[in-house]
Amino acid sequence: MKKIVIASNNAGKLREIRAILAPFGLDAVSQKEAGFDAEVEETGTTFAENAALKAHAVHEALHCAVIADDSGLLVDALDGAPGVYSHRFAGENATDAQRCEKLLELLKDTPAEKRTARFQCVLCYVNAAGEEQFFSGVCEGVIGTSPRGENGFGYDPVFCVGEQTMAEMTDAEKNQISHRGKALEQLEDFFKTL
C-alpha cells in the first residue's frame, strides 16, 4: 500500500479521507502520525492557496508525498460566505454546533429557494520532489432550517442534498457525493497515470 501524509489533524476530515483513499490502495497517515506537530496558519485568500500552504509546510519538514485539503461552505444568500473562513466563521474556538447556529441565525429570514449553497474542496498534492498538483470538487445543496443527523462534522447537519442532510447520510453515501470525495477521485485518477 502506498503511504501518503495528510496535512491535517482534523479527526473528521482524516476519517473521511482515509475511507475514500483506502479502496485505492493508499495508506493515509495524519501529519502528527508522520511526525509533524505544528499547526500551519491558513493565511491564503483561496482554498487553493491554503491547501498549498499546508502541503508545502508538511513536505518541507518530512520530505515525502503530502496531500492537503482546504474546503468550505459557500452560501449564495451570504455572497459566498463563510468560504475560506468556514472554520473560523463563528469565532476561532467555536464548535461545529456554534458555526451551524450562527449560519442558521443569519439565514433565518431567507426563503427556501434562496438558501442554495455548495461545499467546495481543493486538494493540493505535493510529490516527494516537491511538485504540486491541484484537484477540486463541489457538492451542491441547500441550507436547511435546523440541524438534523448525527454523522459527519462541520456544517453537515444543516447542508441538505435532496431530502437528507449530509449528517443523516452514512459515511459511504456522503463520500459518494461529497466535494472531498470528488476531489479525491480526481487524485486517484491522477495516480493511475503515474
Segments from the language model and where they lie:
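Anionic-ligand binding patches
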Residues: 2-5, 11-194
